[in-house]
Amino acid sequence: MLLYDLLLHLLSPLLLLLTLIDAKRRGGGFAFIRERFGFFKRSPANPRLWFHAASIGEVQLALPLIAAFSSKGVLLTCNTPEAFRLAKKQLSADVEVHFCPLDFSGAVNRLLSHYQPSALFVVETELWPRLFAEAHRRRIGIFIINGRIGHKTSASPRFIKKLYRQALAQVTYVWAREPIDQQRFIALGCPEERISSVGDIKLSRPENAGLPTSPLLSTPYSLAISTHHDEEQRIARAWMAAGKPNLLVIIPRHPPRAANIAKELADKGLICHRRSESPIPPKSTDVYLVDTVGEVANFCAHSEFVFVGGSLVPVGGHNVMEPAMLGKAVLTGPHTITQGSAVDYLSENNAIAIATKEDELASLWQRLSTDNAWRQQLEASAKRAIDKLPDRVQIYREQISRVID
């Protein structure tokens, strides 16, 4: 751990620079810089429970759990400005939402002293050695929710694996996503008696059925969500090859990229407008870029179909269950390793279309745009698949209730 602390301090100028860049580029502001180094301006509300959800995906998973325990006093920390904005928009005002400090001893201890939580719930895969060590030293229970360990983490260098082992030694309990994740946690050093496989919270029957009301657009559109660099151009090419069947709406994974995306697509001769500048796109618009936060569900619900990004580039995919739970036809690319269980489940139920290469993306885009019967078949299959899911959110609520009561 001493070597880890020394390395962090040696890297502190670089980490400060990266934090400053992120604050400016991603709209975090001064609060992002201050809190990432453990300085919290507001007086402590003494929340009992601390949830940590690194980015947008983890925040979305945590929202129903946080809502269930908000009366007990909840602090939610995030790593990114986008996740912070989503949490502030979706959660009630009595939930404290802040940025998580970097893993410096001083920064971590300032947060722990400021809020004095009794339990820490980490969503998915955030194993921070210093944070876990300091929380354990203060006898704060550490729990991992929907624990996931990917192949890359399992194949980490020996030095990194040693740090993971040290972090996992401090963990009170891990609720793993799947048996394979449970095995990987154990291989990294998690004691067998402190882990069980509870199921993937993403594969949980939604509690509030029905589509969001009041569509944000009056014109038909196809939708691409959670896109990454280079995906927007590939999607636009597929959409053009399909004959520009309707308006193309793109919601990038990181909204601050929208200006650059608009320029890149405009250079290809496409007319682009951003939602932050044009709440209603002009009729001449080819591509409408949604650079706002908290509107994905509405755009999904009223789209013709939904392409889920992070899958045309080796990111590993994003949450294909979100549009499926809204009864939409779902299209994805080949890179879905982080969403394997969800993609497999929808595939087994004939509720997803997968483009294995770029020219196939164009043909599937065209078919989804023109073959109403096939699109409706995918929608019906998605609804049936979702109806069969267990209520894993409730299972996790029960697990959390047992350890805090």
Language-model region placement:
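Nucleotide-activated sugar donor-binding and catalytic core shared by glycosyltransferases
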Residues: 1-405
